[in-house]
């Protein structure tokens, strides 16, 4: 299969693109060596504010929507960066968009992908590390932070949680100018 991931994402998202969604990002999940494992397509309809986020994987027939089967749990996003900086503190946020914004600002950041993915993820790459949880400023964000904190504490991590309620009226990290 010679189709580039970007072209495959456009093909697989064609229906949403016809409905007015615009591409925002194609997030690549890799192993610690940088080998691609799967991608997440992110589109946004700027008229409605709705997001369209779908996983994409490469199988024997080409790129298709869906995630590979991960018996040990889904990999963390930016896993290569985590492996390259094993002694640095890590910021965990809810989505790839936020992790990329933090990385652009110079922080080491990762995510499990979404507020409901904490229990479906392989967090062992963070074992014993200093971790700062930066949840979204909503109920789902608090549930996510609580779930991730419990998992990380069991892995021997030192965990800090950003109290987003005291920040200036922001819903999510990327609303803050970084």
Range-by-range predicted roles:
Residues 23, 28, 32-37, 46-52, ...:
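TOPRIM fold recognition
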Residues 50-80:
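Aromatic- and Gly/Pro-rich amphipathic surface segment
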Residues 17-20, 74-86:
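A short acidic-Thr-Gly-centered motif at the start of a beta-strand
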Residues 2-19:
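Conserved active-site segments centered on acidic
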Residues 1-7, 172-177:
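Glycine- and charge-rich intrinsically disordered segments
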């Amino acid at each position: 299969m010679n189709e580039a991931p970007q072209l495959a994402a456009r093909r697989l998202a064609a229906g949403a693109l016809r409905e007015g969604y615009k591409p925002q990002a194609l997030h690549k999940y890799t192993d610690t060596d940088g080998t691609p494992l799967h991608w997440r397509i992110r589109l946004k309809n700027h008229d409605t504010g709705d997001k369209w986020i779908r996983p994409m994987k490469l199988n024997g027939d080409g790129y298709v929507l869906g995630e590979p089967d991960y018996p040990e749990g889904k990999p963390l996003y930016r896993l290569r960066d985590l492996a390259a900086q094993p002694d640095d503190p890590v910021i965990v946020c809810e989505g790839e968009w936020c992790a990329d914004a933090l990385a652009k600002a110079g922080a080491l950041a990762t995510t499990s992908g979404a507020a409901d993915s904490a229990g479906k993820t392989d967090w062992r790459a963070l074992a014993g590390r200093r971790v700062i949880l930066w949840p979204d400023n909503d109920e789902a964000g608090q549930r996510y932070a609580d779930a991730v904190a419990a998992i990380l504490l069991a892995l021997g991590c030192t965990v800090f949680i950003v109290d987003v309620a005291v920040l200036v009226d922001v819903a999510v990290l990327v609303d803050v100018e970084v």
